Amino acid sequence: MMKMKQQGLVADLLPNIRVMKTFGHFVFNYYNDNSSKYLHKVYCCVNLFMLLLQFGLCAVNLIVESADVDDLTANTITLLFFTHSIVKICYFAIRSKYFYRTWAIWNNPNSHPLFAESNARYHAIALKKMRLLLFLVGGTTMLAAVAWTVLTFFEHPIRKIVDPVTNETEIIELPQLLIRSFYPFDAGKGITHVLVLVYQFYWVLFMLIDANSLDVLFCSWLLFACEQLQHLKQIMKPLMELSATLDTVVPNSSELFKAGSADHLRDGDNPPPPPPPQSDNMLDLDLRNIYSNRQDFTATFRPTAGMTFNGGVGPNGLTKKQEALVRSAIKYWVERHKHIVRLVTAVGDAYGFALLLHMLTTTITLTLLAYQATKVNGINVYAASTIGYILYTFGQVFLFCIFGNRLIEESTSVMEAAYSCHWYDGSEEAKTFVQIVCQQCQKAMSISGAKFFTVSLDLFASVLGAVVTYFMVLVQLK
């Protein structure tokens, strides 16, 4: 059994995890006792059976009503629309280890005393945005389920059957249900009708939430990565100022130091601290208790020429421990950027193939919806349902693309932030650091759909353009 760990992305995304557990996703970690885990396994299996049962009955109805082209198209759209949910439930169950790995990847992030406040601020911003995203998508999903239910009672469904011999059209009244489905009994009368309505409402609600909860999880990961990149950009300027204090020149080479500005080391009457123990790697020093007050952490160091280099003070006016703190700040930035890259890579591994399946299904659905849209001839239930399908389907794609596009923009803007700093006034270490940053950030971070496409607004624009073009062609041919 794996105990609940209130840390990292698990703690940040705990509301998302609870929603996924509540609505039947196979999330079998983060429990406090084995009994809850066992009961949840039974619940998930029963829930999946109920969802698959209704999905299968819809497929049978598709075959039964395949004689009429309009009915065939409408039933196919419904089946494809809910295919997302079945695919994502099964996808998570099969590839859950990749999702657990992504949740755990931020359990032990590196930290630095100089940038703790900035890190906490951007973490709080990310947390607020992730909660807001979950609330908005959850509210929209509930509204869609209610609208779907209400729309059902505005029109009594019928089915037209054309007699091939007499060419007469026979109209058959169908049960007033949320979705057209085959049942081996009469589902249009009495208590049976009520029970089927309740079952179908449960089915629609759970299917919508199961699909969207996994989509929100994906977008929350990207949102968190974007805010971490914002954090790195924000600390770039103070990091450059710190890096500029380092220099590797030998003593008495004061001509290499530029004239300082008003920023300087705070002079004190206390004698310099004793030299620290020598170490082969200054980056690995324990930096705790180096400074005793806040001013020591916020001081801006200036190279000081002509001073006596003793007592552990180097040619740049920094003690060995101060130099170690500055170098550890550079190390913090690099390691945090590597950590973000690992997070984005893990997200792509966990969700990339699901994105491919989603886009393939969506492409077929939108193509059929474009055909359905050409048959809209007024304000009625048919028009409302067609428009609802289109808006909801495009909304799902847009949700992926807007966060994928932001990840690309934020990752490329890191290089711009590094280049715009006054790196040319710094030491050789500062210049080397900026060069490495620019080289590593030339290629933008992105999420791909199993290497077939990149999730961005360009993808959304191409899908939208293709659907509009196809719709206009159908209108011209009509």
Swiss-Prot record:
Q: Which residues are listed as membrane-spanning?
A: 44-64, 74-94, 134-154, 191-211, 350-370, 383-403, 455-475
Q: Which InterPro entries match?
A: 7tm6_olfct_rcpt
Membrane topology per the entry is: Multi-pass membrane protein
UniProt keyword list: Behavior, Cell membrane, Glycoprotein, Membrane, Olfaction, Receptor, Sensory transduction, Transducer, Transmembrane, Transmembrane helix
Report the gene knockout effect.
Impaired behavior and fitness, probably due to loss of pheromone sensing. Ants also display gross neuroanatomical defects in the antennal lobe, with a dramatic decrease in the number of antennal lobe glomeruli.
Sequence segments annotated as region (Disordered):
261-281
Q: What Pfam families does its record include? A: 7tm_6
List the subcellular locations: Cell membrane
Question: Which residues are sugar-modified?
Answer: 167
Q: Name one GO biological process term.
A: detection of pheromone
Task: Provide the tissue specificity.
Answer: Present in antennae (at protein level).
Instruction: Give residue spans on the Extracellular membrane side.
Output: 65-73, 155-190, 371-382, 476-478
* One GO MF term attached to the UniProt entry: olfactory receptor activity
GO CC, alphabetical: plasma membrane
Q: Which residues lie on this side of the membrane: Cytoplasmic?
A: 1-43, 95-133, 212-349, 404-454
Similarity comment text for this entry:
Belongs to the insect chemoreceptor superfamily. Heteromeric odorant receptor channel (TC 1.A.69) family. Orco subfamily.
Q: What else is known?
A: In contrast to other ant species, C.biroi ants reproduce via parthenogenesis, enabling stable germline modifications from the clonal progeny of injected individuals without laboratory crosses.
What does this gene product do?
A: Odorant coreceptor which complexes with conventional odorant receptors (ORs) to form odorant-sensing units, providing sensitive and prolonged odorant signaling and calcium permeability. Obligate coreceptor of all odorant receptors. Orco is a universal and integral part of the functional odorant receptor, involved in the dendritic localization of other olfactory receptors. Can form functional ion channels in the absence of an odor-binding odorant receptor. Plays a central role in the perception of olfactory stimuli in ants and is essential for ant social organization.
Subunit relationships: Heterodimer with conventional odorant receptors (ORs).
Its protein name is Odorant receptor coreceptor
Q: Which gene encodes it?
A: Orco
